[in-house]
Amino acid sequence: MDKIIKSISKNGHFRAFALDSTLTVKEAQERHQTWPTSTVALGRTLIAGQILGANEKGDTKITVKVLGDGAMGPIIAVADSRGHVKGYVKNRKLDYKKASTGEVLVAPFVGNGFLVVVKDMGLKQPYSGQVDLITGEIGEDLAWYFLSSEQTPSSVGVNVLLNEDSDTVKIAGGFMLQALPDATDEEITEIEHNIKSMPSIATMLTSEEPLKTMLDNIYGDMEYKNLGEFPLEFKCDCSKERFLEGIKSLGREPIEEMIAEDHGAEIICQFCENKYEYSEDELKALLK
């Protein structure tokens, strides 16, 4: 099972999350049948959603939108505070452009644009924050969002490693580190050095204790407390009933057209690819 470990330095000056999201991204790839570059971009956005969701409490829903002008098109992830995430990428069929390290580059396909984060806390108006994409590689863009919109200095790393022979997901995960108000400049410099000199996310995720390895590398000589492990998973909350309500909201005329022309309806959820079919009788019942 995928999981996240939440932690805080013993002096209370820093906090960090470490995530193993391998099964989450695998399921997304299988459901959407994405090609390599699209898989990595969607996977990173899903992990970003899980990081933001882990920051929240209660029934808050987080929507992450990567809105670039490149060939990728929009990438959307919706997460909650319980570790659930769902998402999709507009262009599923983008293939390799590798860096010299062998990692897949997504920025050339994301292009220029915005990272938008919407927090729905069940109040009248959801909170929405928007920043420019500074790299298009997702992790750095999320760190910029935290600094720009939430005034919290942060470092974020997210990555997806593919099996070279099959283009399926081998491993996926990431981390978030945030400096809290009492952190000194000296401590921040120390943590920055740790993050710059630590192994790649892919290397750490393939170690024996991946999440502990990640946190040990982030904190270095600084002592920290493990605040607990929490499950993560790809989970969509769509249902036949929910989509039926959506059809009902279209009004009489479109429903009558569906009955006359198609003798029913079929809806495919864009977040998870589940298919729902509605008979003529089910549609007629909406008109009563």
UniProtKB/Swiss-Prot annotation:
A Gene Ontology cellular-component term: cytoplasm
Cystine residue pairs: 236-238, 269-272
Keyword field contains Methyltransferase: no
Keywords linked to the UniProt accession: Chaperone, Cytoplasm, Disulfide bond, Redox-active center, Zinc
InterPro entries: Heat_shock_Hsp33, Heat_shock_Hsp33_C, Heat_shock_Hsp33_N
Known function: Redox regulated molecular chaperone. Protects both thermally unfolding and oxidatively damaged proteins from irreversible aggregation. Plays an important role in the bacterial defense system toward oxidative stress.
Protein name listed in UniProt: 33 kDa chaperonin
Underlying gene: hslO
